[in-house]
Each structure stands twice: as C-alpha cells, then as structure tokens.
Regions:
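ATP-binding N-terminal substructure of ATP-dependent carboxylate-amine bond-forming enzymes
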Residues: 1-95
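Internal nucleotide-binding/catalytic subdomain
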Residues: 154-295
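Active-site "cap" helix and flanking loop/linker of ATP-utilizing ligase/carboxylase catalytic domains
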Residues: 246-270, 287-359, 370-372
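Generic C-terminus detector
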Residues: 369-373, 377-429
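Active-site nucleotide/adenylate-binding loops and adjacent lid/helix of ATP-dependent enzymes
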Residues: 4-5, 99-183, 213, 237-253
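Short, conserved charged micro-motifs
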Residues: 53, 163-166, 342-344, 391-398
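Solvent-exposed alpha-helices and their adjacent loops that cap or buttress functional pockets
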Residues: 21, 36-38, 60, 90, ...
C-alpha cells in the first residue's frame, strides 16, 4: 500500500512518522515535505494548491490513500476532484470544509442545529459593525473574526470599544486579511478552559482521539499575540469521560447528522476547538484537518495501526475502530524564530538535532527547516516541535524541555510553561 501526505510542517512530519512505522520503506510519500520528513519518507517538491498536479502525482505513483495536512487544498476542493477520479482521500468535500473556510457558515450551521457556541452576528458593513461595538451589543472583551482562512491570525480579542472599532476598520475597510475579511463574525467572549477535540469521521460515525490543549499566545502565561500554536499537551485532564459524552452528543453527532442531511457527509478529521464553560462545552471554532501543534502530541499516543482507520473513514465504512491508545502524557513544545508571529529572520544553522534524536521518549518534528548542504537551517516562524512523553506530566514536560534545550539556533524562542496547566489539573484531580 502507498500513502501520500500533503504538507510541509511538523503536523505532516508527525503523520508521516506514524504511518512510516506501519508500511515498508518508500511506501509513504510527502509533498512537498521537509528535511525531517525526508529521513523517513520520500519527499516530492510540489505546489499542493495546484490540485491537478497533486491528482497527477497520486495517479502516477499509484497512491492508495492521500491524507491532506493543511486546510487550503480542502477549501479548494481537492476531495471532490479525487472522488471524481476514483482516488481515496482522507478529508471533507469543499462544501463540508466550509466549517473552517467560512466562520459565518459555521456559526449559521451551529445556530440551525442548536450546537452550543458563543452568541454572534455577521457583518460586512463597517458602520453597522461599529454601531454594534458602540452599543456594547456583546459586551467587552469582544471577539472579532475574519470570515475566511487567515492562517490562524484572523481572530482579534478586543478588550474595549476603541480596540474593537480599530479591529473592524482594519478588517472591513483597510482589508487587513484581504478576501478572508470581506465579512466578519462578532461574538461574545467566552470564559473557561480551552481544549482541542479530534474525531475521525466516516460520514456517519466518529472515533475520538485523545483530547489535547493548545497554547496559542507567543509568551508565557498566555501573553502576547496569537500564533499558530507554541505547544500542546495530551491527554487533557479537563476532558473527562462524561464531558466526552456531552461533546459527542451535543456537538459531533449534530454536525455529522446536519451535513449528511445536507448531502455533504463529513469524512475526514473534525477538529473541534472547545471552550469548557461553566454551563458545558461550547464550540470556539471548527477545523477540518489535524491541528498543529496538537497532532504532534496526539499521534504518538496511538500505538495501534492508524492507516486502516483513515482508509476506512475515507471510504465511509469505518464503524467502531479497535485501536490501542497510550495513556502516557505527551507534551509538544515549539521552537520558534525570534520575532514570530511578526517578521523574523531565517537561514540560521540548527544545532543539536542528532543528540536529541537519540534521546529516549523524545520525538523531533520539523516545520520551518531547510537542507543547505550538510546543514539544517531555519526557514520559517515555527521551526521545530519537540515532544516528550512519560508516565506522568512531570516526566513528559521534563523530557520535552531537556531535549529542546539541546537544540540551538540564533534567535530561538520557546515558551517555558507548556504543560503546566495539565500539571496543576492532574495534581488536583
């Protein structure tokens, strides 16, 4: 069996790392991949937004299953194209992918099906949105979101009216996010603990992976601007078995039923960003693919074979999988370039990788890296994810930080508090 993974980040490295353990050498291909992936799979340079080029690659390589990492190919309709060509692909159709590609669509979908989420209003007219801010329609802080895909940077939490008005102007008048900000969602600010919930879906049924928690802000103690994610841990002590049942009953099942009734059954990975409020779980956002950096913490927990589950889900015939999952805590810490998520320099040599790759219960997943001669150099904002695992969160955290402290490059930035929330929760539970 041959598998194709699309993408070039640490998420895709984690996916390839897992699948490469289940298949003979050379059976897992990644496009375009990165230097870390190239050590365990075959990388083919390719623009994955060019859907026809991806389809041609899948045909020429006799690919049995394609797994889509990032959201853009899904939003462009790669699953629809592959389905017409009779090619198996793990991911939702373009229509179903609107759960992520349009926040307005997602909010309206949830409202129609009574799926718990924040109160909201959609605006495309700046004066109307500013009027809502001045009236304090949703109170303060207030959350403003660009409707379309904005690379994880399209959300602004405004603490007061002046900040909210400026956010409205930057989105709707100055077009800060381009076409992604033609309309915006304004919603109430929710209080509680955030969690990420992954479910593999076959259109009718869903199988949950261990819940995780992300760390979006650039600095310790959740300070500074939002990023794509500076670290994650799993399993989340906040997501108890009873809460998991509520998430399935109040969110996952209504999503699957609603999309099935609309004629667009959801097959693929459904990522539910949750706020665990005092009244129960509420949806912050949907993503239609594996999250980054949560995937780096979650996938190593799956000790059984993942490929058969993904293939069965893609074909709409998953049923109830039987797959072994570790209970050991896993902690993923991101090493980023100085200046990220703003402008940052790249091209610095990365040291310490060989030493870290020999450490037990540690995994290194490449993101913004490039091979230059014999050296690995920085090539992006988020450079690497380092994952530590252990019998307790104390051990997993210590492993992750011991490893990441061996890695060197000019301007390396690391949050020092990844996993501390889990530590406090597990100690008080």
């Amino acid at each position: 069996m041959k598998v194709l993974v699309l993408g070039s980040g640490a998420r895709e490295h984690a996916i390839v790392w897992k699948l490469a353990q289940e298949h003979p050498p050379g059976s897992v291909i990644c496009a375009p991949g990165n230097p870390g992936i190239a050590k365990i799979g075959r990388c083919i340079p390719l623009d994955i937004a060019n859907l026809e080029a991806v389809r041609s690659l899948a045909v020429s390589e006799s690919i049995d299953l394609t797994i889509v990492g990032p959201e853009l190919p899904l939003a462009l309709g790669i699953v629809d194209m592959f389905a017409k060509a009779g090619l198996a692909i793990f991911g939702p159709t373009r229509a179903a992918a609107q759960l992520e590609s349009s926040k307005a669509f997602a909010k309206e979908f949830m409202a129609a099906r009574s799926i718990p989420t924040a109160q909201y209003q959609v605006y495309s007219d700046a004066p109307a949105a500013i009027k809502a801010v001045r009236e304090g329609r949703f109170g303060f802080p207030v959350v403003l979101k660009a409707d379309g895909l904005a690379g994880g940077k399209g959300v602004i939490i405004a603490p007061d009216g002046a900040t909210a008005e400026q956010a409205v102007r930057s989105m709707l008048i100055e077009r800060r996010f381009g076409d992604a900000g033609i309309q915006i969602v304004m919603e109430e600010y929710m209080e509680g603990e955030e969690a990420s919930f992954f479910a593999i879906c076959d259109g009718r049924t869903a199988w949950a992976l261990p819940a995780s928690q992300d760390h979006k802000r650039i600095f310790d103690n959740d300070c500074g601007p939002n990023t794509g994610g500076m670290g994650a841990f799993a399993p989340s002590p906040c997501v108890t078995p009873s809460l998991k049942d509520r998430i399935f009953g109040e969110i996952i099942e209504p999503v699957l039923n609603g999309l099935s009734e609309a004629g667009t059954p959801y097959r693929g990975l459904l990522y539910v960003g949750l706020m665990l409020t005092s009244t129960g779980p509420k949806v912050v956002e949907f993503n239609v693919r594996f999250g980054d950096p949560e995937t780096q913490a979650v996938l190593p927990m799956i000790t059984g074979e993942l490929t058969p589950i993904l293939l069965a889900a893609a074909k709409g015939e998953m049923g109830t999988p039987k797959c072994a999952v570790s209970t050991w805590p896993h902690v993923a810490v991101v090493a980023a370039s100085q200046g990220y998520p703003g402008s940052h320099e790249t091209g610095f040599t990365i040291g310490g990788l060989e030493k870290v790759e020999q450490m037990s219960d540690v995994m290194v997943f490449h993101a913004g890296t490039q091979q230059v001669g014999d050296d690995i150099k920085t090539a992006g904002g988020r450079v690497l994810s380092v994952v530590g695992r252990g019998e307790t969160f104390d051990v997993a955290i210590a492993k992750a930080y011991e490893a990441i402290d061996h890695i060197t490059f000019t301007g390396k930035h690391v949050r020092r508090d990844i996993g501390k929330k889990a530590l406090s929760k597990s100690q008080t539970s």
